[in-house]
Every structure is written in structure tokens, then in C-alpha cells.
């Protein structure tokens, strides 16, 4: 790889570190090509990506970035799993690590916050952006449906009482 290619890789990695909601660093030694393809497919489905890069170039790309503290994790055969959604990459990495013991999560970064192994696990258990939006919408919609039910209830109660009175009158 010549100098121009290295500079391009550093620039691409820098953009990844700046634009990603979360970046997870893991060791992947011993994984087969099929297992790596499975990891990439899972990440793609979740809206994320997987990148294997030279640690030295990744460390250069981290210089001056908010997540620069993550540079200490870049040793050995490392892979970066990242996504704009702050939860997606962590969920993909955790799920893949449970299925593949050779995939060892080291930590990562979420914005300016460095994450250790437990931090990545905690982030993976959080609801995704879409799930949070759905929860908020249901919370906003619940009072309106309760009010509509309360307004409609007296009318249905009156109708029920009237039908009972009519039935009793007809029976007598």
C-alpha cells in the first residue's frame, strides 16, 4: 500500500469515527471467511458496517477525534463494527460474539465516551432509535385514546341501561 492509499484509508476511517454513533472494537482471530461474511451481513441488516483496518492507520485516524481514547484497544487482529444508530453496532457485535466464541469484543466508543466490554454490552441492551420512537408515540397517543374512551363510555352506558329497561318492560 503506497502513501496515497494509506492517506485515503486514514481519511475514510476518520469519517467513520466522526459520523458513527458507536464503534465497537473486537478481535477476530480464527474466524472463517464465512463467519466474517455473516458478521458483515448482520451489520448491513442493522444499518451498520464492518471494517478491518491496519491498527496503525486507525490510530492515526483517531488523533484529534472525540473517541481518541479508543486507540488503546487497537492491538492484534482487530475489526471495527460501527453504525450511525448508537445501538445497532453494539447489538450486532454482542449477538455475533454469543454465536462465535472466537469473536472477542474489546470495547469501543460512543461519541466522546470510551466503552469497555461491559459498556458495549450495556449499550446493546438499550432499545434502538426506532423502538424509542415507537414507545414515545404510544405514550403520546395513550392519553388521547383514554379521553376518547371516557367520552364515549357514558353514551354506551346510557344505551345499555335503556336496552335493559326496555327488555324488562317487554318481559313484564
UniProtKB/Swiss-Prot annotation:
Top-rank lineage group of the source organism: Bacteria
Entry annotated with the keyword Ribosomal protein: yes
InterPro entries per record: Ribosomal_uL10, Ribosomal_uL10-like_sf, Ribosomal_uL10_bac, Ribosomal_uL10_bac_type, Ribosomal_uL10_CS_bac
Name of the protein described by the UniProt record: Large ribosomal subunit protein uL10
Family named by the database record: Belongs to the universal ribosomal protein uL10 family.
Function in brief: Forms part of the ribosomal stalk, playing a central role in the interaction of the ribosome with GTP-bound translation factors.
Gene: rplJ
Gene3D superfamilies referenced in this protein's UniProt entry, alphabetically: 3.30.70.1730, 6.10.250.290
One GO location term (cellular component): large ribosomal subunit
Keyword entries, A-Z: Ribonucleoprotein, Ribosomal protein, RNA-binding, rRNA-binding
UniProt KW Lyase keyword: no
Pfam families membership: Ribosomal_L10 (PF00466)
Subunit structure: Part of the ribosomal stalk of the 50S ribosomal subunit. The N-terminus interacts with L11 and the large rRNA to form the base of the stalk. The C-terminus forms an elongated spine to which L12 dimers bind in a sequential fashion forming a multimeric L10(L12)X complex.
Example of a GO biological process term: translation
MF term (GO), any: structural constituent of ribosome
Amino acid at each position: 500500500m503506497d502513501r496515497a492509499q494509506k492517506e485515503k484509508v486514514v481519511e475514510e476511517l476518520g469519517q467513520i469515527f466522526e459520523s458513527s454513533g458507536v464503534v465497537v472494537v473486537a478481535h477476530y482471530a480464527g474466524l472463517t471467511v464465512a463467519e466474517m461474511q455473516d458478521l458483515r451481513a448482520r451489520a448491513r441488516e442493522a444499518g451498520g458496517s464492518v471494517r478491518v483496518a491496519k491498527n496503525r492507520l486507525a490510530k492515526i485516524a483517531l488523533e484529534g477525534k472525540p473517541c481518541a481514547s479508543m486507540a488503546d484497544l487497537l492491538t492484534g487482529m482487530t475489526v471495527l463494527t460501527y453504525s450511525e444508530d448508537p445501538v445497532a453496532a453494539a447489538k450486532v457485535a454482542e449477538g455475533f460474539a454469543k454465536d462465535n466464541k472466537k469473536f472477542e469484543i474489546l470495547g469501543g466508543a460512543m461519541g466522546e465516551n470510551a466503552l469497555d466490554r461491559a459498556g458495549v454490552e450495556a449499550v446493546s441492551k438499550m432499545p434502538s432509535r426506532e423502538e424509542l420512537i415507537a414507545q414515545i408515540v404510544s405514550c403520546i397517543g395513550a392519553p388521547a385514546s383514554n379521553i376518547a374512551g371516557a367520552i364515549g363510555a357514558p353514551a354506551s352506558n346510557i344505551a345499555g341501561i335503556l336496552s335493559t329497561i326496555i327488555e324488562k318492560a317487554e318481559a313484564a
